Amino acid sequence: MTRQIQLALATFRPRRAIPGQTVLDPSVTRTRVRLGDLDIYRHVNNAVYLNMMDTGRSNLLADCGGMPLLNDRGWYPVVAASTVKYRRSLTLGQRVEITSRVLGWDPRIAYLEQVVTTGGQLAARGIVAGRFLSKTGDRVPAPDVVALLGGPETSPALPDDVAAWARAMDVAHRS
């Protein structure tokens, strides 16, 4: 439950924007492993990684000044698909960094990478296909969101593995 509170704070009382931060710059979220994050095997439950990544994405938007802009338009992010590869267990009290970055976008989806590390070692890597909706439920084109956040008109080329993943997950835009 405390992770949900952390996400609510990151979303509704976002941290201050970082001057000069763009939508393509990485954003770092720092936290510690808490007792409530652990499963019966005494390591972080896989669902908790997803909660940490949710907070990381909210902080990414906050860091580039996006939260008030999105709120003014009634736009909000949702996850269309995600995949996480777990590399190392996290245990009670460990310091954790979640580095979130936008890799690129197509007409519908923004693609993000989220890397979870502890002590400089990789614990997990997530790939997320995110989209934005309006309060009425209409889809907001990813390029419109990127433009609102001051990003470039043209998406960087997606890494090959992410482009292949997007096709396999059936989230990639079909021309």
Locate the predicted segments by residue.
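Sequence-level motif detector for i,i+2 pairs with an aromatic at +2
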Residues: 24-28, 74, 81
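Membrane-helix exit/interface motif
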Residues: 61-66
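Short structured motifs
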Residues: 80-86
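Short, basic/aromatic beta-hairpin or loop at an interaction surface
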Residues: 68-77
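HotDog/MaoC-like acyl-thioester-processing domains
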Residues: 1-17, 90-95, 101-175
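Short histidine-centered beta-strand/loop micro-motifs
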Residues: 40-43, 88, 94
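Catalytic strand-loop segment that frames the active site of acyl-thioester-processing enzymes
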Residues: 2-59, 160-175
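Generic structural detector for well-ordered beta-strands
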Residues: 30-34, 85, 131
